[in-house]
Curated annotation (Swiss-Prot):
Pfam families recorded: K-box, SRF-TF
Protein name: Transcription factor CAULIFLOWER
Protein source organism: Arabidopsis thaliana
Domain of life: Eukaryota
Stretches assigned to the MADS-box domain: 1-61
Gene giving rise to this polypeptide: CAL
């Protein structure tokens, strides 16, 4: 007896519904992978759970390429079906909005994956692709970091060389000034010694003039005669002052 057809309806029990979703999702992703491998077809699968969690599969390395291809194909078909320009404009805006929204959601999901979040629904191939992308990004980051470090090191080396050259120039100038000062000091000392070694000139004395200068001429020794006369007068005055009482006494005695 054949098995009867099971009616499809929403599972009311939350736990059973979650278990069924996990099983069917795994099987669906497996079937999508099988058809892409067996038939060499480009397959993309997007699934949102009742809580809004995203699950996807893409035979390409990037889901964005598949979505952009789908948008271009759908846009071309809608252009042929809807001739009205107003309807076309609304359709274009709606399609652009949907495209941008899907792209934003995809970027946000990729960002969470790069941070190591929501990795459970990803397959082995998706994890390998994510690992490869992270390794490539790390290589670029390390390369840029090494480049900046080398540039900084070269700048510091050039700065050090400039400082050393400036220091050498200042040292050379200081030595030149010291040599100039030392030379001037040596010249001054030599000049002082040469001045001290020169004999002092003696006054010239002619013998005849020397004899004339020592003669006791009243005309040539006026100051001396004046001094002698003055001294004689002083002695006379002293004698007069001293002997006057004696003379008076003798005079009285004689009388």
């Amino acid at each position: 007896m054949g098995r009867g057809r099971v009616e499809l309806k929403r599972i009311e029990n939350k736990i059973n519904r979650q278990v069924t979703f996990s099983k069917r999702r795994t099987g669906l992703l497996k079937k999508a992978q099988e058809i892409s491998v067996l038939c060499d077809a480009e397959v993309s699968l997007i699934v949102f759970s009742h809580k809004g969690k995203l699950f996807e599969y893409s035979s390409e390395s990037c889901m964005e390429k598949v979505l952009e291809r789908y948008e271009r194909y759908s846009y071309a078909e809608r252009q042929l079906i809807a001739p009205d320009s107003h309807v076309n404009a609304q359709t274009n805006w709606s399609m652009e909005y949907s495209r941008l929204k899907a792209k934003i959601e995809l970027l946000e999901r990729n960002q969470r994956h790069y941070l190591g979040e929501e990795l459970e629904p990803m397959s082995l191939k998706d994890l390998q692709n994510l690992e490869q992308q992270l390794e490539t990004a790390l290589k670029h980051i390390r390369s840029r970091k090494n480049q900046l470090m080398n540039e900084s090191l070269n700048h510091l080396q050039r700065k050090e060389k400039e400082i050393q050259e400036e220091n050498s120039m200042l040292t050379k100038q200081i030595k030149e000034r010291e040599n100039i000062l030392r030379t001037k000091q040596t010249q001054c000392e030599q000049l002082n010694r040469s001045v001290d070694d020169v004999p002092q000139p003696q006054p010239f004395q002619h013998p005849h003039l020397y004899m004339i200068a020592h003669q006791t001429s009243p005309f040539l020794n006026m100051g001396g005669l004046y001094q002698e006369e003055d001294q004689t007068a002083m002695r006379r005055n002293n004698l007069d002052l001293t002997l006057e009482p004696i003379y008076n006494y003798l005079g009285c005695y004689a009388a």
